Amino acid sequence: MFNIQSDDLLHHFEADSNDTLLSAALRAELVFPYECNSGGCGACKIELLEGEVSNLWPDAPGLAARELRKNRFLACQCKPLSDLKIKVINRAEGRASHPPKRFSTRVVSKRFLSDEMFELRLEAEQKVVFSPGQYFMVDVPELGTRAYSAANPVDGNTLTLIVKAVPNGKVSCALANETIETLQLDGPYGLSVLKTADETQSVFIAGGSGIAPMVSMVNTLIAQGYEKPITVFYGSRLEAELEAAETLFGWKENLKLINVSSSVVGNSEKKYPTGYVHEIIPEYMEGLLGAEFYLCGPPQMINSVQKLLMIENKVPFEAIHFDRFF
């Protein structure tokens, strides 16, 4: 085990050579800045002041080459090779309620929702604990580790993931096409979790496989007997995925699902409004002011919706919770 110490003395923890600095800090239940845990966002940047690390992904998009030359690294993409002294660059926004743990699961079933997106149902030996909205790191030996969000309410030892097979994506394609009986998971991770109070209406906005955490959060609210309006905007270019959304969310009178097709070809009968999600929301915006907003999808979608909410409609930043898929 190696000792990790930050220059401001706020972060002091131990890490072994098999753990990233980020995972080790979160296992120690420390407040540490991060978002994607996949090298894309750059939220977990550190400056290495003393010691040596193994950089798992030198070309990670979350870190510019000039920053690497300044001895900066991503905590989610480096492992310690010695005792370290570090400087944490960004300010942490909050603490997750469940420290991540490694555990084994058995693949119970796989159900395709479209040609590209599928649902994996897993079963662990122990109770799987997480907050609705969080994700898990899924390891496929020799191929890599990827982050996938839980798509079910907390339910004993079962866990449901929704995965989108990405062209040339080694992990997602292996999960889609191969018969895999067991999977190693690490989690939960993520700070964009369900925070809605009983007196506040809730709005969920997702694109593609970003639907997964929304299904978890919405169905949790339904199970809890939440009575305020729930509005879901879901965008996809595949009609099969829009149809799947209608079955993934539990039914309740206060739930309104608005599917949006981003493809005219995939919306041949024009069953759904065509365009991007952020282009459809304005016609509903007047009735949504004062809500808590939850966003999940690719960075471009998140940025467009944030602009719509904060700049054009003055929604406070504190009322917007987002998870960007990189």
Swiss-Prot record:
Q: Which family does it belong to?
A: Belongs to the bacterial ring-hydroxylating dioxygenase ferredoxin reductase family.
Q: Name one GO molecular function term.
A: 2 iron, 2 sulfur cluster binding
Task: Tell me, in a sentence or two, what this protein's role is.
Answer: Reductase component of the toluene-4-monooxygenase multicomponent enzyme system which catalyzes the O2- and NADH-dependent hydroxylation of toluene to form p-cresol. Ferredoxin reductase catalyzes the transfer of electrons from NADH to ferredoxin (TmoC).
Cofactor(s), by name? FAD; [2Fe-2S] cluster
Q: What reaction gets catalysed by this protein? A: 2 reduced [2Fe-2S]-[ferredoxin] + NAD(+) + H(+) = 2 oxidized [2Fe-2S]-[ferredoxin] + NADH
| Record protein name field | Toluene-4-monooxygenase system, ferredoxin--NAD(+) reductase component
**Keywords on record:** 2Fe-2S, Aromatic hydrocarbons catabolism, FAD, Flavoprotein, Iron, Iron-sulfur, Metal-binding, NAD, Oxidoreductase
Q: What is its EC number?
A: 1.18.1.3
Q: Where does FAD bind?
A: R146, A147, Y148, S149, I162, V163, K164, K170, V171, S172
Positions with a binding annotation for [2Fe-2S] cluster: C36, C41, C44, C76
FAD-binding FR-type domain spans which residues? Answer: 100-195
Pinpoint the 2Fe-2S ferredoxin-type domain residues.
Answer: 1-92
Q: Does the keyword Phosphoprotein apply?
A: no
Segments carrying the region annotation (Ferredoxin-reductase) are 95-326
Gene3D superfamilies tied to this protein: 3.10.20.30, Nucleotide-binding domain of ferredoxin-NADP reductase (FNR) module (3.40.50.80), Translation factors (2.40.30.10)
Give the InterPro entries listed for this entry.
Answer: 2Fe-2S_ferredoxin-like_sf, 2Fe-2S_ferredoxin-type, 2Fe2S_fd_BS, Beta-grasp_dom_sf, Cbr1-like_FAD-bd_dom, FAD-bd_FR_type, Flavoprot_Pyr_Nucl_cyt_Rdtase, FNR_nucleotide-bd
Taxonomy, top ranks, is: Bacteria, Pseudomonadati, Pseudomonadota, Gammaproteobacteria, Pseudomonadales
Give yes or no: UniProt keyword Flavoprotein. Answer: yes
Explain how, and how many, cofactor molecules are bound: Binds 1 FAD per subunit.
Q: In which pathway is this protein known to take part?
A: Xenobiotic degradation; toluene degradation
The record ties this protein, via SUPFAM superfamilies, to: 2Fe-2S ferredoxin-like (SSF54292), Ferredoxin reductase-like, C-terminal NADP-linked domain (SSF52343), Riboflavin synthase domain-like (SSF63380)
- Superkingdom assignment: Bacteria
